[in-house]
Every structure is written in C-alpha cells, then in structure tokens.
Amino acid sequence: MSNQLTINGLQLPASYCALAAKYEGFDGFCNLKLKNPKDSFGYPLECELAQIYSNEQKLKEITDSLNNYFVPDGYYGELDSNDTDPESLKDITDFKKIVCFGIAGDGSQFCFDFRDCANVPTVIWWEDDHWRKISNSFEEFICLFSNS
C-alpha cells in the first residue's frame, strides 16, 4: 500500500496508510486492544480494532456498501432517533464523505468522517444503534490502542 490513498475523491491520512501497510501481510488483521476504556474525549469505549482494510479495492467496496446498510426506515434516519444519547451523532444518510476503514471484533464499523474537514477527517464508530465520534483525527484514534 502506498503512503497516499484516495477513496471516492477523499485522501486518507498518511498515518492510516502506514498502519495499513504494516498489517497488509496479515490481510489487515491487527487485533489492537484499548489502552484504557475511553475514547479521545474521555467517554467510555468498549471495543478493539480487529481489522483495518489494507487494500484500495476492499476500502472502496465496504465504503460503497454503507448506503445499503444504513437506510432510512422509519427509525434510522429520523431527525430525533438518537437525541437521548449525548455522545451520538445524527444518523448519517449521505455517505459521500464517509470512508469505512476497519471493524471491531463485533463487526461494527470504524470510519473516517470528512463532512466537517476535507483534510483531517474525524473518526466515527457504529456503536450498536448509533454513530459516535470517538477521535478528532486518526492519529488521536490510534493512540487509544496498544501495540499500534
């Protein structure tokens, strides 16, 4: 994997490309555990980074499939569906500026969110029934894990 990678017109962070290259020979399986059970903002976080997508084809395939999995259905995509959880983001219904880069052990997605900044995406995670911002950057995100 090169140190520059663009998916759907969005350039992924160089630090992500370096980590993906490190685990490319393992098909992206990294099984990184949290150092502490908290996200970059101090909120509780219980997950691990099981796999990162280490090739462009897989990144594009998984990213393009997000629109098929997260469809407004009367609950998901409704304006007030997650208003009770202060850590949750509004349901995403337009994934043009989202790139899925990995999964936790339970299959929940880790994604880059380029909606607010095209140069430094935040990291969001699908937590059971809502999206949640867990880091301001990939560099912050990867510092949450041991052996990265």
Which residues fall in each region the model found?
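Broad, structure-driven detector of short, well-ordered beta-strand segments within folded domains
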Residues: 108-116
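A short alpha->loop->secondary-structure connector
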Residues: 119-121
